[in-house]
């Protein structure tokens, strides 16, 4: 939105993790896309002096003490958007003075919900607006602009149910591998969160069965002849996604989405799938993500704690069209109800 409404401004987009950087390293909206150097005093000082920003915007959990200190020292307006706070966080403990000091470096904090605003008020942080989560706007924009993939359209037309396993880890695959292999009328799209050639090859071998082939997405999309596409998709069992940046476009072809990470450090982006009006399934480690609880409560999301529960939910969804439809509709409606944070924050920051 900044690029569209304020095209004269330069935009530097930084990431700390490879998973974010790899997806956006060629992002045309930003003038510079780069990694953020480690949060040391010297790195922060050099970074701020080199970039010399007019303002800085951090997202959700971006609390980098040295960077915040340098930005405040230079009187650079600094904002935190889509933030969400929990009582268990360090800011709200008796020993959390250093962390509370970080909050004082922000010019304003834009939080997702009233509960976060109340927690902050309890420690005398009042420069707070409740605006919601910008990720709802982002996934809605992606949904509206995703490109069609002809080979996936052909797969959809075969009548097979398609389940997208997004940001999948080995712990996730251990839960759904047997079920997926045993259901000949299901095609799986597996997008591993991290991969190399060895991991991709192992996934191909693991999910190829006598009833169907498993191929890489790049192999599928390289087929351009209509007859060859039809022949390939008719006998497909599984597609392994072997490039970054494709997952958000692939969810549109799914009937169900399983989002990985819930048996590790925490679930990945479930809104990317829910926006397409399909039910989302995920593991138990989702406490940091308000949208997971909200989706469970509205009937659009399902938490699973193990293999048996996952298989039960998958069996219900693929065998009961009414449940599949109502769950998907609930997920899509939840996303639609929560859009609007981005324009609200933009108007506030730029005083429109």
Model-identified regions with their sequence ranges:
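Catalytic binding pocket for nucleotide-activated donors in carbohydrate/polymer assembly enzymes
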Residues: 106, 122, 247-333, 348
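C-terminal alpha-helical cap of glycosyltransferases
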Residues: 338-352
């Amino acid at each position: 939105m900044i690029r569209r409404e304020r095209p004269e401004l330069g935009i530097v987009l930084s990431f700390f993790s490879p998973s974010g950087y790899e997806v956006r390293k060629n992002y045309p909206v930003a003038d510079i896309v780069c990694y953020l150097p480690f949060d040391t005093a010297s790195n922060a000082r050099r970074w701020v002096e080199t970039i010399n920003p007019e303002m800085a915007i951090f997202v959700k959990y971006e609390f980098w003490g040295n960077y915040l200190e340098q930005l405040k020292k230079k009187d650079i307006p600094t904002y935190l958007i889509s933030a969400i706070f929990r009582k268990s966080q360090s800011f709200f403990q008796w020993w959390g003075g250093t962390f509370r000091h970080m909050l004082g470096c922000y010019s304003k904090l834009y939080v997702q919900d009233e509960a976060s605003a109340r927690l902050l008020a309890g420690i005398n942080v009042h420069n707070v607006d409740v605006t919601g989560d910008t990720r709802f706007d982002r996934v809605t924009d992606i949904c509206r602009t995703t490109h069609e993939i002809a080979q996936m359209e052909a797969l959809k037309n075969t009548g097979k149910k398609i389940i997208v396993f997004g940001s999948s880890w080995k712990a996730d695959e251990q839960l759904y591998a047997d079920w997926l292999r045993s259901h000949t009328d299901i095609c799986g799209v597996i997008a591993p969160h991290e991969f190399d050639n060895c991991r991709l090859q192992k996934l191909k071998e693991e999910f190829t069965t006598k009833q169907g082939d498993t191929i890489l997405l790049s192999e599928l999309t390289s087929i351009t002849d209509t007859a060859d596409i039809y022949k390939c998709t008719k006998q497909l069992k599984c597609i392994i996604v072997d490039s970054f940046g494709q997952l958000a476009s692939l969810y549109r072809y799914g009937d169900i989405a399983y989002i990985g990470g819930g048996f590790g450090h925490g679930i990945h982006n479930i809104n990317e799938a829910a926006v397409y009006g399909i039910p989302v399934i995920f593991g138990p480690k989702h406490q940091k993500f308000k949208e997971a609880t909200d989706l469970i409560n509205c009937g659009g999301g399902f938490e699973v704690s193990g293999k048996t529960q996952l298989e039960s939910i998958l069996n219900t969804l693929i065998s009961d069209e009414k449940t599949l439809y109502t769950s998907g509709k609930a997920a899509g409606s939840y996303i639609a109800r929560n859009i609007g944070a981005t324009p609200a924050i933009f108007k506030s920051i730029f005083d429109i």
